[in-house]
Amino acid sequence: NLLADGFSMAASNYLGTKSEVDQFQRYKTIEEKHIDFIPEGEKNEIKQIFQNKGLHGQALDQVVEEITANRALWIKTMLQEEYGLPATLRFPLKSALYTFSAFLLFGIIPLIPYVLVMNNSFIWSCFFTAITFFVIGSIKSHWSTKSWLYSGFETLIIGTVTASLSYGIGLFLHHLLT
C-alpha cells in the first residue's frame, strides 16, 4: 500500500507540474506571437505595467526601452506580470521523484513498530506518526513565515485529525462488513 500510494502521489505531482509547464509554454507562445505581430501593443502593456508600479516620465521610458530591447526579458516580464507565472519552472519528473522519495521515507516510519514486532505496536506507531508529522511541519517552516514550532504543531494537528478520520472510517467499514 505504501508503494502504491507513493506512486499515486508521484503521478499526481508529475501531472500537476507538467500542467504548469504546459500552461507556461502556451502563454509563452501567445506572447511571442503578440510581440511578433503587434509589438507596439505589447510595448504599451509593458508601459502600463510599470506605470501601475509607480514609474513615470523618463524612468518609465527607460525601463520600457530596456525590457523591450531584449526579447527574452520582454517575454519573461509579460509572463510574470500579465499572467502571474513563476520565473522558473519545476521539472515534472524531478518533482515526482522527490514526492515519491519523501512519501516512502516518511511513510515507512509508522511501520517500524510492526517490522520490529514491538509490544503495543499500534501505540508506538501512533507516537512515531505524531513525531513524523511534527518534524515534517517543522521542516515546512523553512519555506513559511511561521516559526518551526507553529508549523510543527499545525502539521501535527492537521495530520492527527486526518489520520484519525481515516482510521475511524476504516473501523466503521470493518464493522459494517463483518
Please report, for each region that a protein language model flagged, where it lies by residue:
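Internal alpha-helical transmembrane segments
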Residues: 1-16
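Residue-level signature of catalytic and energy-coupling elements of molecular machines
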Residues: 11, 50, 60, 103, ...
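Cytosol/matrix-facing amphipathic helices and coiled-coil assembly/linker segments
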Residues: 17-99
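Core segments of transmembrane alpha-helices
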Residues: 99-110
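Generic transmembrane alpha-helix signature in multi-pass membrane proteins
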Residues: 109-114, 139-141
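Structural signature of hydrophobic alpha-helical transmembrane segments
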Residues: 119-131
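Interfacial loop-to-transmembrane junctions
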Residues: 135-161
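Juxtamembrane boundary at the C-terminal end of a transmembrane helix
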Residues: 167-178
